[in-house]
């Protein structure tokens, strides 16, 4: 069995039952653009907000007394396998930056404004002695050290302030994606346990502190202490540092953007909803696409698709956070390469995204109902794809990439052979050594051949994986109809797929392009896996569990 996704856990099962239908009276989630969810502030918190906004109010900073200080501390927890430093070492056209890295790039930094970046689990983080491990990718190993490090870095900033300078406020903002979003939630949870409520505000070591904003992309815990506990995932990986994901009341505003089409079973979602109710300091927004279509991190042309769809969630998060006072630079003032990562002005991209949003029949309602509405659109497209009625531009692109790579590899091999022929001696003569010039040409041809072989394998594997997922999907749809014919009650997931297959209305071409050119297939990372395109992942609402598959 060949498995390409390092987050894979062999034979993982979830033996604990959960609801297969929406929870009665569940709070509303929404789709795409929506005003932020911010709880009512106390008089003390309103005062602290004005203090925190000092650096972005014209001339306010100059007027502030130098005997006082406001510490602005923003921490960015990247997702599993995401590492800004590793990506920035690549050439621009191969970078796969997450939205967390892009937001960190856009954040201000000076003597009063501190931004701290925490690399994703499974990647190198020398500051905590983590070289990046398979256990980090699969089980979240090292997340606890990252959370502690973020708290230590905060304490270090406080310790830097001279004794004669009064700290007026510690202003905290936090961002995270995937397990990094779980780390961000654990960070504010642990911070809250160290704080005391006083006069309508909060104190940290007798210093005024506020957690102004938490920006989260698609929270996934999947935290395990050993491979054995990971195999039987009865609690979705809510272990050790990830035991409690409830956001503390001290967080003034939380925005959680979640992936409408993620299907992988071992990527259970942790909603910010608790049972049926949303706390007043949080809002959840569905965005189309799978996990990394929302949080970012796909490489350009991965699966023959663009990696630009995540820019819609990126810009939305930036706008809400900026309006809330998070100290981002104005986008127009960012350096060119950073600004380019926010660009969503491509006409085809915008047309496809807008057409998709228009096609979603239910954009606001309980999370489960809105999820079903998004899934119905995707399954209408899958129905056409597996029937061959929808021309697959992404597959055609992969075929071109594969064929071009094969030609380039063959040309490089021919070049190597020609250089070797230059060295042929007479019969019985010793073959002479390469000259420096020949060695240089041969090494260049070898590199070209190896790179081309890698690109060929990548494109060919993607085509193979996509094809096998389509076959399994057809079997699953047939099973739904068989179950119904036997008088078995269908779940919300099964009813949604069946309704999509029986919907005879044509799917707009722009919606097809959305799925085919921009939205990825996260299940197809594997040559074999228990996850299927017909699956919906489990969603946790605190201690409650929606298990549609």
Where are these regions (language model features)?
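Active-site- or binding-pocket-proximal scaffold segments within functional domains
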Residues: 2-549
